[in-house]
A protein has these predicted regions:
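C-terminal helical cap(s) of enzyme catalytic domains, especially alpha/beta-barrels
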Residues: 293-315
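Short active-site-adjacent structural elements
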Residues: 61-63, 265-268, 294-297
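N-terminal capping/small domains of soluble enzymes
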Residues: 1-113, 120
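Alpha/beta enzyme core
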Residues: 66-89, 93, 101-108, 112-116, ...
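Conserved beta-strand segments of the P-loop GTPase G domain that flank and frequently precede/overlap
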Residues: 54, 159-161, 260
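Short acidic/histidine-rich active-site segments
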Residues: 285-293
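N-proximal accessory regions
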Residues: 3-19, 36-43, 114, 239, ...
Length: 315
């Protein structure tokens, strides 16, 4: 729990020492994403999977959870929930926008226990396709760009790519993502690029929806696997399909991280879908946000623990 006093100190530190976040980022103790290839084969799942907590929704204007449109609006509450999650030994890291990464770095310096040391940190990149906007599928890079990822010494970048073949704006985002992959992987020491490809469509009311059918997911997996001049550093972030996960994830040899979403009161069903999908050979872990940080019963620690044990059975 982040007390009012601690949060006030964070606010003061931001106002009076804006340079501090970069200093802390550059001194952060990093770790590899996974164990080195030559260390595989020990029989343990240690070092072969990743469990990341996601907190990049607010920057896209998506602050609702369940039936509460303002659930993620209180930053102190959000940070408290994230610190609870990141303190779990089964959580390997974070996916977030610059503001949240910096908040957590600063909080760590104030408490004397870094929240992001020995964690994998992915920076969220394109947040411009605001939730519910008329231009939602035209999703430009408005958060971390390539230079920002390297300057803050993060471990990777994340791109969202929703593809609706009936909406020309999707093509703009496909190009943005391909260009970002090219720039990131052309650096002397490339970073991982996590791409979240989602088959999208508009319902009768014009609302954007995601199609999780096997056929639709296989189609976008094929498209994204070929983006950019190399796929060597590309990871896929995908929802559990509505059926037949092994068939879906057989569409590519690229590593996959499952996403969470907002399950409402169907959290147990979501956990079961993760457990089933985790059996596919390419699935290497989980990236979950609202489903664990704002569960229906508000037991953040309990839900994070259950998810961690799906990803890391040896816990």
């Amino acid at each position: 729990m982040i007390t009012r006093d601690l949060y006030q100190r964070l606010i003061d530190l931001r106002a009076h020492a804006p340079h501090k976040a970069l200093e802390l980022a550059r001194s952060r103790r990093r770790r590899p994403l996974l164990a080195p290839y030559d260390q595989l084969g020990s029989g343990s799942s240690s070092g072969t999977r990743l469990f990341l907590v996601a907190a990049d929704h607010p920057a896209r204007g998506a602050i609702g959870v369940g039936g509460d449109p303002m659930r993620m609006a209180d930053r102190r509450d959000l940070l408290s929930r994230l610190t609870t999650a990141l303190s779990h030994p089964g959580v390997d890291g974070l996916l977030a926008t610059p503001d949240i990464v910096e908040d957590l770095l600063l909080l760590g310096s104030l408490t004397g226990s870094s929240l992001l040391d020995d964690k994998v940190v992915f920076g969220s990149m394109n947040r411009g396709g605001l939730s519910g906007s008329a231009w939602e599928l035209d999703d430009p890079i408005t958060a971390y760009h390539t230079g920002g990822l390297f300057k803050m010494q993060l471990d990777g970048g994340k791109l969202l790519l929703r593809i609706d073949r009936d909406d020309p704006d999707s093509l703009k985002t496909i190009y943005q993502c391909a260009r970002a992959i090219r720039v990131i992987t052309s650096q002397k020491s490339p970073l991982a690029v996590m791409v979240e490809p989602l088959p999208a469509y508009r319902d009768e009311d014009g609302a954007l929806k995601i199609d999780t059918s096997p056929e639709a997911l296989i189609g976008v997996i094929a498209i994204v696997s070929g983006l950019g001049p190399t796929s060597a550093y590309t990871w896929l972030k995908l929802p559990p399909p509505s059926s037949d996960p092994r068939r879906v994830f057989a569409a590519s040899s690229l590593p996959v991280l499952l996403l969470g979403g907002d399950p409402g009161d169907r959290g147990d069903e979501l956990l079961a879908s993760w457990a089933e999908a985790m059996e596919a050979p390419t699935v290497r872990g989980l990236v979950a946000g609202r489903s664990l940080i704002y569960p229906a019963d508000d037991d953040v620690e309990g839900w994070v623990d259950r998810a961690a044990r799906i990803v890391h059975p040896d816990l």
